């Protein structure tokens, strides 16, 4: 596949590198490009701390500075630039109470949800893939990074995202990841109705709207939409 990055993204990467920082395109943009799709947006991961990012660029917005994210506005478009980090405890089952900034790209990739979203890219180094994301794309598999049960206990929305990615991409959910969803299903109650509906709508609008049945099969539906669950009977 060929990576053709927008000029604005190249300029941001170049500026960070010129000042001695590591910087990569990260996450969904890498996944989409590998799959031959045009990314909707480009997120950048860097060793630069938020205050350093703000010094380097003329127009920035503190969109998530607590978690290391600054939006850099370049040619009237915003690009999220996030410092490499590790996450602290997830006491609410959705968000880390704290984050620790790190200088290591691998540690940053290790905190991400699925292998297909845990890759980075830089023109001079190519794709950085510590957890087999390219292989899982080739084999059409949704797989958690690390221990899936731990990933879902950190952020319960990830269970629903796994099924949404499965529906949108027509990928299979890896066995251990699927088992962990079934085991942790009750935790979906910690997720707001708005976020649940957002993910469910994406499933229904995908090429596999029938994947809504998977919400029943893994036990999520009974906690999300009990009135709809009754249409299916008992979870498998």
Task: Describe every region a protein language model picked out.
Residues 1-236:
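Catalytic cores of the polymerase beta-like nucleotidyltransferase superfamily
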């Amino acid at each position: 596949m060929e990576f053709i990055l927008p000029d604005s993204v190249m300029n941001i990467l170049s500026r960070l590198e010129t000042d001695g920082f590591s910087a990569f395109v990260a996450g969904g943009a890498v996944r989409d490009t590998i799959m031959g799709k045009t990314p909707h947006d480009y997120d950048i991961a860097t060793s630069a701390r938020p205050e350093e990012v703000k010094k380097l660029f003329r127009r920035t917005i503190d969109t998530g500075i607590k978690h290391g994210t600054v939006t850099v506005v370049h040619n009237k478009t915003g690009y999220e630039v996030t410092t490499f980090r590790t996450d602290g405890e997830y006491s609410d089952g959705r968000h880390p109470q704290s984050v620790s900034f790190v200088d290591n790209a691998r540690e940053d990739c290790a905190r991400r949800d699925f292998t297909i979203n845990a890759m980075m890219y830089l023109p001079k180094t190519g794709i950085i893939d510590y957890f087999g994301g390219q292989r899982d794309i080739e084999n059409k598999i949704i797989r958690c990074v690390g221990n899936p049960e731990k990933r879902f206990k950190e952020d319960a929305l990830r269970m629903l995202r796994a099924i949404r990615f499965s529906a949108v991409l027509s990928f299979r959910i890896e066995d251990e990841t699927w088992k962990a969803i079934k085991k942790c299903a009750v935790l979906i109650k910690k997720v707001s109705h708005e976020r649940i509906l957002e993910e469910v709508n994406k499933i229904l609008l995908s090429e596999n709207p029938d994947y809504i049945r998977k919400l029943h099969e893994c036990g999520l539906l009974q906690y999300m939409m009990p009135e709809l669950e009754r249409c299916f009977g008992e979870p498998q």
